[in-house]
């Protein structure tokens, strides 16, 4: 074979090998960096742009797609210890002609974390209202979506600021009072009584604990490689002390049942979505809400746990689109 041809293959092979080796090295040595790159790439692919808004010296980080139009804008609030990118799996299946805004909740990701911040549910509601006013999102009423802790905040927000919200989607929200505790809540109470706050199941610090948390939150058993579990833990560990502080704040007497205490004040059309096999917050919470919110509808998803957004993103997006179409008399075809 001609020497130039051999050299060409060597150069081509080396050129291809460099990114492959870089990827393998990242996967093995810096899995957390790979996870960040993954979210960055996914945001770009879906057309989500990251921006910052400021209220005095407080910074909010958010991503958005689209512009306000004749359809309601959609504001999405994530759950405890998550971030705005958790919604990307749902955004993928939402129409591109909708104005979507996903914000990092107080203290999370790119939003300001302050030791002076009021992390109670009502405190978070007031912060989100500041964000809404920064963006002038309430220039006309918007659709509000929240899951878990974000659902807790969303429900109380709709009660506190009814003129801001035209409709509401609550995805397995926290903040309700049940007649009996499920095993997860019983375990939390035992930890609380023993003051073992280092062992909160929703705040993993090892790959094994991360795997246990994923099993707790999901009905579907995802097979997650050890390196990815390590990466997920590495991303969270620097923030775990904040997560503990936040967790203790939202489960104390001041905040624990804020949604329950305010649900009868919610007057906008409300959609309640819950995974039937939710091990974190029992699915019976859907009936509790439906009995107090007169203009509500319940969607219970079979074979689905607490992580509805991650387990059933396509179904969640369809339910939201159908709900908006029915509530706002919009042709469903135009939303798709």
Curated annotation (Swiss-Prot):
<dbReference type="GO" id="GO:0098982">
    <property type="term" value="C:GABA-ergic synapse"/>
</dbReference>
<comment type="function">
    <text>Lipase that preferentially hydrolysis medium-chain saturated monoacylglycerols including 2-arachidonoylglycerol. Through 2-arachidonoylglycerol degradation may regulate endocannabinoid signaling pathways. Also has a lysophosphatidyl lipase activity with a preference for lysophosphatidylglycerol among other lysophospholipids. Also able to degrade bis(monoacylglycero)phosphate (BMP) and constitutes the major enzyme for BMP catabolism.</text>
</comment>
<protein>
    <recommendedName>
        <fullName>Monoacylglycerol lipase ABHD6</fullName>
        <ecNumber>3.1.1.23</ecNumber>
    </recommendedName>
</protein>
<dbReference type="GO" id="GO:0099178">
    <property type="term" value="P:regulation of retrograde trans-synaptic signaling by endocanabinoid"/>
</dbReference>
<dbReference type="GO" id="GO:0005739">
    <property type="term" value="C:mitochondrion"/>
</dbReference>
<dbReference type="GO" id="GO:0031966">
    <property type="term" value="C:mitochondrial membrane"/>
</dbReference>
<dbReference type="GO" id="GO:2000124">
    <property type="term" value="P:regulation of endocannabinoid signaling pathway"/>
</dbReference>
<dbReference type="GO" id="GO:0045211">
    <property type="term" value="C:postsynaptic membrane"/>
</dbReference>
<dbReference type="GO" id="GO:0032281">
    <property type="term" value="C:AMPA glutamate receptor complex"/>
</dbReference>
<feature type="transmembrane region" description="Helical; Signal-anchor for type II membrane protein">
    <location>
        <begin position="9"/>
        <end position="29"/>
    </location>
</feature>
<dbReference type="GO" id="GO:0046889">
    <property type="term" value="P:positive regulation of lipid biosynthetic process"/>
</dbReference>
<dbReference type="GO" id="GO:2001311">
    <property type="term" value="P:lysobisphosphatidic acid metabolic process"/>
</dbReference>
<keyword id="KW-0812">Transmembrane</keyword>
<dbReference type="InterPro" id="IPR000073">
    <property type="entry name" value="AB_hydrolase_1"/>
</dbReference>
<dbReference type="GO" id="GO:0052651">
    <property type="term" value="P:monoacylglycerol catabolic process"/>
</dbReference>
<keyword id="KW-0735">Signal-anchor</keyword>
<keyword id="KW-0443">Lipid metabolism</keyword>
<dbReference type="GO" id="GO:0016020">
    <property type="term" value="C:membrane"/>
</dbReference>
<dbReference type="GO" id="GO:0009395">
    <property type="term" value="P:phospholipid catabolic process"/>
</dbReference>
<dbReference type="InterPro" id="IPR000639">
    <property type="entry name" value="Epox_hydrolase-like"/>
</dbReference>
<feature type="active site" description="Charge relay system">
    <location>
        <position position="278"/>
    </location>
</feature>
<dbReference type="Pfam" id="PF00561">
    <property type="entry name" value="Abhydrolase_1"/>
</dbReference>
<dbReference type="GO" id="GO:0031902">
    <property type="term" value="C:late endosome membrane"/>
</dbReference>
<feature type="active site" description="Charge relay system">
    <location>
        <position position="306"/>
    </location>
</feature>
<keyword id="KW-0496">Mitochondrion</keyword>
<dbReference type="GO" id="GO:0047372">
    <property type="term" value="F:monoacylglycerol lipase activity"/>
</dbReference>
<keyword id="KW-0458">Lysosome</keyword>
<dbReference type="GO" id="GO:0046464">
    <property type="term" value="P:acylglycerol catabolic process"/>
</dbReference>
<feature type="topological domain" description="Cytoplasmic">
    <location>
        <begin position="30"/>
        <end position="336"/>
    </location>
</feature>
<dbReference type="GO" id="GO:0004620">
    <property type="term" value="F:phospholipase activity"/>
</dbReference>
<dbReference type="InterPro" id="IPR050266">
    <property type="entry name" value="AB_hydrolase_sf"/>
</dbReference>
<keyword id="KW-0967">Endosome</keyword>
<comment type="similarity">
    <text>Belongs to the AB hydrolase superfamily.</text>
</comment>
<dbReference type="GO" id="GO:0120163">
    <property type="term" value="P:negative regulation of cold-induced thermogenesis"/>
</dbReference>
<dbReference type="GO" id="GO:0060292">
    <property type="term" value="P:long-term synaptic depression"/>
</dbReference>
<dbReference type="GO" id="GO:0005765">
    <property type="term" value="C:lysosomal membrane"/>
</dbReference>
<dbReference type="GO" id="GO:0098978">
    <property type="term" value="C:glutamatergic synapse"/>
</dbReference>
<dbReference type="InterPro" id="IPR029058">
    <property type="entry name" value="AB_hydrolase_fold"/>
</dbReference>
<dbReference type="GO" id="GO:0030336">
    <property type="term" value="P:negative regulation of cell migration"/>
</dbReference>
<feature type="active site" description="Nucleophile">
    <location>
        <position position="148"/>
    </location>
</feature>
<keyword id="KW-0378">Hydrolase</keyword>
<keyword id="KW-0472">Membrane</keyword>
